[in-house]
Swiss-Prot record:
Its main location: cytoplasm. Keywords: Cytoplasm, DNA-binding, Fatty acid metabolism, Lipid degradation, Lipid metabolism, Repressor, Transcription, Transcription regulation. Gene3D superfamilies: Homeodomain-like, Tetracycline Repressor, domain 2. It is found in: Cytoplasm. GO terms for biological process: fatty acid metabolic process; lipid catabolic process; regulation of DNA-templated transcription. One of its GO terms (molecular function) is DNA-binding transcription factor activity. This is Fatty acid metabolism regulator protein. Homodimer. Binds to DNA. It comes from Bacillus subtilis (strain 168).
Length: 194
């Protein structure tokens, strides 16, 4: 399978760097090829066009993240522990790869409707993890019965996503991972003074 070949991943990793540095619209396939250390034509053995590279990049990176997350949350007992893990892993992934953070938080957002639909399809695995955590939490009594799981999932993902976007927009000047517990507590306890 060509996706597992080393050159495929070289191109994916090079695309992350080039797109982060130049922006998606200013990133030519030739720049990606040069960064990857391959001939321009080699790119087309793996990808149809630049848009395909962007989608594949997101699918590859998010797919790996989702697979690891599905395994890691099995080791956690409660919904709160699982949610804490999702938040910290999400923040750690992007804090550890500044270029990937720029691509996922800024460049993917500037794409056309068709591209956004493909990205949303890839995100379904992540959202399913959140749905599972919420559903298990309701069943165990940890989360209140009658919770609108879909709305809660959107709010959780939106909070995580916006926290990362703000960090990227602020030139990554502070410790994103250090915000994990604060974000968790806000999501779990809300703003109500009990």
């Amino acid at each position: 399978m060509k996706q597992k070949r080393p050159k495929y991943m070289q191109i994916i990793d090079a695309a992350v760097e080039v797109i982060a540095e130049n922006g998606y619209h200013q990133s030519q396939v030739s720049k990606i090829a040069k960064q990857a250390g391959v001939a321009d034509g080699t790119i087309y053995l793996y990808f149809k066009n630049k848009e395909d590279i962007l989608i594949s990049l997101f699918k590859e990176k998010m797919g790996q993240f989702i697979e690891r997350m599905e395994e890691d949350i099995k080791e956690k007992a409660t919904a709160k522990e699982k949610l804490a893990l999702v938040i910290s892993k999400h923040f750690s992934l992007l804090a550890g790869d500044h270029n990937l953070a720029i691509v996922t938080q800024l460049e993917l957002r500037q794409s056309n409707l068709e591209l956004r639909q493909k990205i949303n399809e890839i995100l379904k695995g992540y959202l399913n993890i959140l749905d599972g955590i919420l559903t298990e939490g309701i069943q165990s009594g940890e989360i209140k019965e009658g919770l609108d799981v879909r709305l809660a999932r959107q709010m959780i993902f939106g909070t995580i996503d916006e926290t990362v976007t703000t960090w990227v927009m602020n030139d990554q000047k502070y410790d994103l991972v250090a915000l994990s517990n604060s974000v968790l507590e806000l999501l779990v306890s809300g703003i109500h003074n009990k």
